[in-house]
C-alpha cells in the first residue's frame, strides 16, 4: 500500500523572476510541517538552484516554457520535484523510474551545470534525477524529531 501524502503543484513560467513565488510556497509548506528555520532556508536555496538550472539549461534563458514544481508532503519528510518540461507528473510513477544522484555521474549529461547540483546535494537529505524526458530533480528533506511541531509552542530565550 502506498504511503499517504498531500500533493501541492505549482507551475511557473521558465523565468528567473518567478523563483521568489516558489520560495514563498516552499517556506509556507515547510513552516506548516514544522521544519526549523535553517532547514527551510536550505530547502529554499536547493529548490531555487534546481529552478535556476532549468531556466538556464532547459530553456536557455528564453523565457519560453514552464517549470512544474511538485511538493509531496509526508508525515516525516518533504519531497520536492522540479520538472523542466512543465508537464504534470505522477509522483509515484516518477519515483519508480528515478535513480539516486551519484557524485561521479556525468553532470553535463544531466544539464545541471556543476556547482548547483553539488549545492542541492549538500543541502538536501536525498537527491534523485530522471533525465529521460527533460530533467526531473527529486529532492527529499526529512523532518527531524527535534524540530518544533506545527502545533508546538514557540521557543523562547527568556524565562
Question: What annotation goes with each model-predicted range?
Answer:
Residues 37-62:
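Conserved ATP-binding N-box helix of the HATPase_c
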Amino acid at each position: 500500500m502506498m504511503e499517504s501524502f498531500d500533493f501541492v503543484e505549482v507551475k511557473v513560467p521558465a523565468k528567473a523572476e518567478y523563483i521568489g513565488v516558489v520560495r514563498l510556497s516552499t517556506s509556507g509548506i515547510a513552516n506548516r510541517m514544522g521544519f526549523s528555520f535553517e532547514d527551510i532556508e536550505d530547502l529554499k536555496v536547493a529548490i531555487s538552484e534546481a529552478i535556476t538550472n532549468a531556466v538556464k539549461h532547459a530553456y536557455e534563458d528564453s523565457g519560453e516554457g514552464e517549470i512544474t514544481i511538485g511538493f509531496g508532503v509526508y508525515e516525516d519528510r518533504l519531497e520536492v520535484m522540479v520538472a523542466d518540461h512543465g508537464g504534470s507528473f505522477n509522483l509515484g510513477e516518477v519515483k519508480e523510474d528515478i535513480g539516486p544522484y551519484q557524485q561521479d555521474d556525468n553532470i553535463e549529461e544531466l544539464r545541471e551545470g556543476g556547482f548547483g547540483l553539488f549545492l542541492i546535494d549538500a543541502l538536501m537529505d536525498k537527491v534523485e534525477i530522471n533525465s529521460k524526458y527533460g530533467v526531473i530533480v527529486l529532492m527529499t528533506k526529512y523532518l527531524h524529531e527535534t524540530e518544533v511541531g506545527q502545533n508546538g509552542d514557540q521557543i523562547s530565550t527568556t524565562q
